[in-house]
Amino acid sequence: MARYTGPMWKISRRLGISLSGTGKELQKRPYPPGQHGPGQRRKLSEYGLQLQEKQKLRHMYGVNERQFRKTFEEAGKMPGKHGENFMILLESRLDNLVYRLGLARTRRQARQLVTHGHILVDGSRVNIPSYRVKPGQTIAVREKSRNLQVIKEALEANNYIPDYLTFNPEKMEGTYTRLPERSELPAEINEALIVEFYSR
């Protein structure tokens, strides 16, 4: 399955979460596309709830189904809780951490910055969005890319930097200091439903 590249507001409304991080797409019309007015949402089956939760997390991180499933299976081989490990692996993606550092307004924008070679990891250019950053590694904007308007606008937005990251705005450089705890990851996701979905 290919990665979805259409309007994110449609997906946000369908799943009932903000994928842009601003919440604007849910303010005006907080009901699914195609539904004329804020009527009652159709009650989902157990399978439907599990599928919806999987889609929420997959679209949140902008991962295609093949990568998503592969990461899920990898998380199952790690010690600890399967669902929690899965979310930590997704959070450790380079494109996500570029977004978390406030260098991009959205994960989609962060993915483009990585793909176009604007991001360094420990001083070396990495253009793979799914690259897994390890604790202690440094993420920085390439010197030639520091005047990019999209990066300047993102930094001006004063985004919240999670406690598992440190960031120096003058150097446009941050460090992934440690793995996040579950309480620091998206609260609107019930990862147990995703584990149930893939365990069927």
Curated annotation (Swiss-Prot):
Entries under InterPro entries matching the protein: Ribosomal_uS4, Ribosomal_uS4_bac-type, Ribosomal_uS4_CS, Ribosomal_uS4_N, S4_RNA-bd, S4_RNA-bd_sf
As one GO molecular function, the record gives: rRNA binding
Keyword rRNA-binding annotated: yes
Q: Where is this region: Disordered?
A: 22-42
Q: Which SUPFAM superfamilies match?
A: Alpha-L RNA-binding motif
**Example of a GO cellular component annotation carried by this entry:** small ribosomal subunit
Q: Which SMART domains match?
A: Ribosomal_S4, S4
From the UniProt annotation, give the residues forming the signal peptide: none
- Which keywords, in A-to-Z order, does the entry hold? Ribonucleoprotein, Ribosomal protein, RNA-binding, rRNA-binding
Q: Does the keyword RNA-binding apply?
A: yes
GO BP: any one term: translation
Please report the stretch or stretches of sequence annotated as the S4 RNA-binding domain. 92-152
What job does the chain carry out? One of the primary rRNA binding proteins, it binds directly to 16S rRNA where it nucleates assembly of the body of the 30S subunit.
As for family, the record states: Belongs to the universal ribosomal protein uS4 family.
> Subunit notes for this chain?
Part of the 30S ribosomal subunit. Contacts protein S5. The interaction surface between S4 and S5 is involved in control of translational fidelity.
List the protein's name. Small ribosomal subunit protein uS4
